[in-house]
């Protein structure tokens, strides 16, 4: 398997679902990715690194989080600046929620496993008025699929039954991410 310095020399390495988040506690930007090496989709790792402008890339994690396979992933930052990694696991059967360390580059605790056996991917969480909302698409490769959501008041607690949102093919696309502009949230597809 590849080491952080070798990544640039492997043209077949896949880094998918790349996202960047600014960590105000460290003053660094955190990169999160689903990492696969040149052997196809067998590595199932998470790649978490941090960098500053003109600074050196510091890799925190390039492995399976706490030993679990990891495919589609995203980061959620709570109101108290605690970061969580959301990760499709068990070959996309379930979604794991991991608490990250203060640098946001290392999983330290498996908080919950949700959507068990539902084959969801492209995980995303928003928080509004004290309620957490989890959105995802059905694991269907790159084909259009139904966006669904579930909610809770405690990431480690019970979640509501999963519910549909939008039409059955997310308007001939697949749910991707959620962005917030001002006080309004928007779904990317």
Predicted stretch roles:
Residues 1-189:
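Carbohydrate-active catalytic/glycan-binding domains of CAZyme proteins
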């Amino acid at each position: 398997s590849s080491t952080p310095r070798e990544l640039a020399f492997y043209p077949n390495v896949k880094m998918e679902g790349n996202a960047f988040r600014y960590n105000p506690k460290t003053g660094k930007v955190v990169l999160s990715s689903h990492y696969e090496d040149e052997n196809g989709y067998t590595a199932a790792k998470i790649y978490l690194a941090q960098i500053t402008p003109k600074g050196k890339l510091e890799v925190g994690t390039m492995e399976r989080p706490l030993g679990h396979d990891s495919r589609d992933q995203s980061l959620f930052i709570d109101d108290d600046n605690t970061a969580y990694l959301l990760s499709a696991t068990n070959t996309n059967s379930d979604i794991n929620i991991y608490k990250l360390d203060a640098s946001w580059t290392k999983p330290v605790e498996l908080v919950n496993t949700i959507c068990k056996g539902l084959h969801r991917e492209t995980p995303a969480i928003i928080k509004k008025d004290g309620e957490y909302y989890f959105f995802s698409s059905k694991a269907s490769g790159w084909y259009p699929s139904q966006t669904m959501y579930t909610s809770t008041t405690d990431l480690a607690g019970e979640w509501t039954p999963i519910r549909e949102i939008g039409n059955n093919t997310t308007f001939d696309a697949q749910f991707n991410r959620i962005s917030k502009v001002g006080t309004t949230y928007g779904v990317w597809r």
